[in-house]
A protein has these predicted regions:
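Conserved, structured core segments of small domains
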Residues: 1-130
Length: 130
């Protein structure tokens, strides 16, 4: 079963992260690199991607005659998606274990940040069936 593990954050949280020491940032990224390596070795890794900040996001709708209408950034959003992992695992419990490990990434001084990670199953419909 495939699951998406979504890491969300707030502007305040991102601003705090930007104030971390270089060693704290390196420790955090080493944790993520090790997690990715372990998932690749177990065959559970599908992909992961960081996302640009909300200041670069646009909302697009089809306007008259199908011409796209682009709305600007919505700074009032309380949380925004920072990045995601897609994993292919045997059970929901395994997806939760991976999410907990992701959540426990080190922050300042090496203490776990315990960031909430949203876990959702990816439905396995083929495009032709839609």
């Amino acid at each position: 079963m495939k699951y998406i593990l979504m890491m969300a954050g707030t502007k305040a949280g991102v601003d705090m992260y930007r104030a971390w020491s270089q060693s704290d940032i390196q420790r955090h990224f080493a944790h993520l690199k090790t997690l990715n390596k372990d998932l690749m070795e177990s065959g559970e890794f599908v992909t992961n991607e960081p996302l640009a900040g909300p200041e670069q996001a646009k909302i697009v709708r089809a306007g008259k005659n199908g011409v796209p209408i682009t709305d600007g950034v919505f700074p009032e959003a309380k949380e925004f998606l920072l990045g995601y992992w897609i994993v292919d695992v045997e059970s929901p419990e395994r997806a939760y274990q991976i999410a907990a490990r992701l959540s426990a990434g080190p922050g300042p001084g090496g203490a776990p940040i315990n960031m909430p990670i949203e876990v959702r199953q990816i439905l396995s419909r083929k495009t032709e069936e839609l």
